[in-house]
Swiss-Prot record:
Residues 330-415 form the PDZ domain. Interacts with th/DIAP1 (via BIR 2 domain). CDD domains: cpPDZ_HtrA-like (cd06785). Its EC number is 3.4.21.108. It comes from Drosophila persimilis. The gene is HtrA2. It catalyses: Cleavage of non-polar aliphatic amino-acids at the P1 position, with a preference for Val, Ile and Met. At the P2 and P3 positions, Arg is selected most strongly with a secondary preference for other hydrophilic residues. The chain crosses the membrane at residues 67-87. This is Serine protease HTRA2, mitochondrial. Residues 144-307 are annotated as: Serine protease. It comes from the Eukaryota.
């Protein structure tokens, strides 16, 4: 700042010296000429020349003196001001600094803390088709997949029943979070509650803690862990939307369960995985998804009852390894369209027919299954089977139980009505 002021002062002096000096000299010359005229013109030329010399030296002294008398105080004042301003620049200029965000990651990363505490107990479940093999590897192809979690160190795993049963000519494999893979056997199944346990022959596994679903509140944070679309170790988060969603509201007439509803992102492959609270405890088993933001989990309190009964059967030596009834295999996971679910679907999609009042939503089709071969796709709505109106999932099971070789199915795909033919596999 001081250097800038000195430069400006030098420029000012250069500009003002010549014109100012010229004006001062002209003024002095005129004054001297007037004085000599008043004394008369009788003087000789030598005296006039002397006077003229004196006047010239006089106006020179008068011009430079005027310039420096004006400029020196000004320059000194400007220089002092510049020094003072430069020395107090920090005081004159307000300091604005961004608010420090350091430490926020550790303070608010509660989701990461949950995953770190219980994520190792979550497993990926694959159902291998023993009749079809990969061309390059020669290994059985994957017919379907799901999730589960370890509940005992000696290899007991909890999952959904629909993940592992009603799939003939298949075998079950479990992949742990560390990448190890083991064959698994089905120990206990409850198709009514859609729960099952698997066993792998390994010990010392990390175990998921089981919490209490009865203490949950709507709006409470939860974390869904699993393997959606075969992507292992996937984490999504959301809140509990409802704690008492009756199975009748979902069209599941053969079940007496009050489901947990959550908006945590859940999709195909999440089935059987844990829904965890912020204490790292499983408070539900992810079971089904209706649409984005609407998913359901089986409450862990209901699961505990199933596990207690299964433990009693194992003590008596009557575990259900093969004792569950095997139905004709179609290869879909479905959900009854209740009025509430229909309203939600219509509000979220413009492709839903306004006159649709009931039906069954196909939300998963197993690759290579009869349904897949027949042309069914996720999102299709089944309205009729063999010319009979379908109002809920029980009607589909009844159609399978009739034993007819082929099923003539009418579906809605968006707003378009279509016909497909499926030949279910016998057990």
């Amino acid at each position: 700042m001081a250097l800038r002021c000195i430069n400006n002062l030098e420029i000012f002096l250069r500009r003002c010296t010549a014109p100012t000096l010229h004006r001062c000299c002209v003024a002095s010359s005129r004054t001297a000429h007037t004085a000599s005229s008043s004394k008369g013109s009788g003087g000789d030329n030598s005296k006039d020349q002397e006077n003229n010399g004196q006047n010239k030296s006089g106006y020179r002294r008068f011009g430079w003196r005027s310039v420096f008398q004006f400029c020196v105080p000004f320059s000194l004042g400007a220089l002092v001001s510049a020094v003072l301003i430069e020395g107090h620049r920090d005081e004159l200029t307000p300091t604005i600094s961004a608010r420090s965000l350091k430490g926020r990651r550790n303070e608010f990363n509660f989701i990461a803390d949950v995953v770190a505490g219980c994520g190792d107990s979550v497993v990926y479940i694959e159902i291998k088709d023993t009749r079809h093999f990969d061309y390059f590897s020669g290994q059985p192809i994957t017919a379907s997949n799901g999730s589960g979690f370890v509940i005992e160190q000696n290899g007991l795993i909890l999952t959904n029943a629909h993940v592992v049963i009603n799939k003939p000519h298949t075998m079950v494999q479990v992949r742990l979070s560390d990448g190890r893979t083991f064959p698994a056997t089905i120990e206990d199944v409850d198709q009514t509650s859609d729960l099952a346990t698997l066993r792998i022959h390994v010990s010392g596994l990390p175990v998921m803690k089981l919490g209490k679903s009865s203490t949950l509140r709507s709006g409470e944070w939860v974390v869904a862990l699993g393997s959606p679309l075969a992507l292992s170790n996937t984490v999504t988060a959301g809140v509990i939307s409802a704690t008492q969603r009756a199975s009748q509201e979902l069209g599941l007439r053969n079940r007496d369960i009050n489901y947990l509803q959550t908006d945590a992102a859940i999709t195909f492959g999440n089935s059987g995985g844990p829904l965890v609270n912020l204490d790292g405890e499983a408070i539900g088993v992810n079971s089904m998804k209706v649409t984005a933001g609407i998913s359901f989990a089986i409450p862990i309190d209901y699961v505990k009852v199933f596990l207690e009964r299964a433990a009693e059967r194992r003590k008596k030596g009557s575990a259900h390894k093969t004792g569950y009834p095997v139905k004709r295999y179609m290869g879909i996971t479905m959900l009854t369209l209740t009025p509430d679910i229909l309203f939600e679907l219509k509000s979220r999609s413009q492709n839903m027919p306004n006159n649709l009042m009931h039906g069954v939503l196909v939300w998963k089709v197993i690759v290579g299954s009869p349904a897949h071969s027949g042309g069914l796709q996720p999102g299709d709505i089944v309205t009729h089977i063999n010319k009979k109106e379908i109002k809920n999932s029980s009607d589909v099971y009844d159609a399978l139980a009739e034993g007819r070789k082929d099923l003539e199915i009418v579906i809605l795909r968006g707003v378009k009505q279509m016909h497909v033919k499926i030949t279910p596999e016998d057990p």
